Amino acid sequence: MGANMTTITDEKKPRTAPPEVRRKQLIDATITCIAKNCISGTTLAAIAKEAGLSMGLVSFHFKSKDILLSETLKYLTEEHRELWMQDALCDNLSAARKLRSIVDAQFHPRICSRKKLAVWFAFFGEAAHRKSYRATSSQIDMERQKVCASLFSDIIAEGSYMGMDGENVALTLEGLFDGFWLNMLMYPAKFSREESIRQVLAYLEMMFPQHFANQIL
């Protein structure tokens, strides 16, 4: 009877899920596989196994590995964008507060995990997928850079800072973001999310002491 009860229970388990749930499962599995095996070592079979789904379901939701990779990169990019834009476009926040939110979003645990950093740099590092990386992420990177440049220009005007250019400071900030991400991936014992935020805020305080003083943790 115990075996029969187990069979009945198993038969009652749902075997289907909404398409968006299955797609998210497969994208999460792709992120895990790329972090473990890089892009070249990631196969649809490995993704299916990681997700606990059949190859048929993988092929149904994503017709090819390239499509799944493209959708995974798009997911990561949009996830990042949604986070940093939450406060960046709020009219009731100061320019300095918006920039602080952008910095915090860059190193948020949901965005800046070792697993996801490995995936970001895997796309950038493998020549076959670099074009896809640029096509997907460059537009959003430029959007963030323009937002930061505008905010820095506002701060420069507010504080009457001399000899500064908002676009140049925004370019430097983007370089710091990329550099700390890479160092966190390569040297995790020396670089943490918290320390990276402190270093970025130290730079901003040096450039704009009236607006970023006493923000370092």
What is the role of each PLM region?
Residues 109-112, 129, 154, 173-191, ...:
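Amphipathic C-terminal alpha-helical segment
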Residues 25, 32-71:
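Helix-turn-helix
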Residues 1-21, 212-217:
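N-terminal intrinsically disordered/low-complexity leader segments
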Residues 164-184, 196-203:
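Hydrophobic alpha-helical segments that form the core
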Residues 86, 112-121, 131-157, 198, ...:
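Amphipathic alpha-helical packing segments from all-alpha helical-bundle domains
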Residues 92-94, 127-135, 142-169, 207-217:
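Hydrophobic alpha-helical bundle segments that form small-molecule/ligand-binding pockets
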Residues 19-31, 47, 72-76, 80, ...:
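Generic hydrophobic, amphipathic alpha-helix propensity
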Residues 71, 85-116, 166-173, 215-217:
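Hydrophobic alpha-helical connector segments
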